[in-house]
C-alpha cells in the first residue's frame, strides 16, 4: 500500500509534484520513476490545471471533469487551503460521466464502488480529495511510491514537476 507521510521541510524535498484530481498518465509515468514524491500543498493554487480537473474519453471525445472550488478574495491562495464547492451536483455528474464512459469496460464493477466512495466522501479541501484519489490510483497500479506533503512554500528545486502537467505549457 502506498504510504502518505505528512509535512516535509524544503531541504528534504526531492521530487516536487502538484496535487492532482485523477492524475494523468504522464503524471503516473513520471512518479513511478521515484521511490517517493512530495505533493506541494503550499504552492499558490493555479486554476484550470490537474489540481482540480481530469480529462476522460467519452463517446463524444475528451470530457473534462472539473471539481468546483470556492472563490477566495485572496490573490494567492495555497493549494492546501482550497475548499471544494458543493453547491453544484458535480459529484453526481462526475460519477455519471465515468459510468457512461467506462461502464462496459473490464473490471469497472470492481473499481467503480471504490471511486464512488472516494468522490462521495465529501472532503472539505481539494487536497484531501486529491490525496485519496492519488493514493488509490497508486495502490491499484501497484506503485510503491511514498507520498509526502510540503510544510512550507518551495520556490524551486531541481526536480520540480509542478507546472509540467498544465495544458497551458503544451
Residue ranges and their predicted role:
Residues 2-170:
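Residues lining hydrophobic/aromatic ligand-binding pockets adjacent to catalytic sites
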Amino acid at each position: 500500500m502506498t504510504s502518505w507521510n505528512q509535512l516535509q521541510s524544503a531541504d528534504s524535498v526531492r521530487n516536487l509534484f502538484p496535487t492532482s484530481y485523477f492524475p494523468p498518465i504522464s503524471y503516473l509515468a513520471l512518479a513511478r520513476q521515484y521511490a517517493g514524491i512530495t505533493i506541494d500543498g503550499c504552492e499558490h493554487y493555479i486554476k484550470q490545471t490537474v489540481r482540480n480537473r481530469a480529462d476522460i474519453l467519452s463517446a463524444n471525445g475528451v470530457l473534462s471533469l472539473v471539481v468546483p472550488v470556492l472563490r477566495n478574495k485572496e490573490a494567492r491562495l495555497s493549494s492546501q487551503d482550497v475548499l471544494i464547492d458543493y453547491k453544484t451536483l458535480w459529484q453526481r455528474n462526475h460519477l455519471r460521466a465515468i459510468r457512461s464512459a467506462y461502464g462496459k469496460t473490464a473490471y469497472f464493477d470492481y473499481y467503480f464502488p471504490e471511486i464512488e466512495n472516494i468522490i462521495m466522501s465529501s472532503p472539505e479541501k481539494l487536497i484531501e480529495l486529491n490525496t485519496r484519489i492519488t493514493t488509490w490510483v497508486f495502490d491499484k497500479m501497484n506503485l510503491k511510491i511514498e507520498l509526502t506533503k510540503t510544510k512550507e512554500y518551495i520556490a524551486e528545486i531541481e526536480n520540480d514537476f509542478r507546472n509540467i502537467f498544465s495544458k497551458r505549457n503544451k
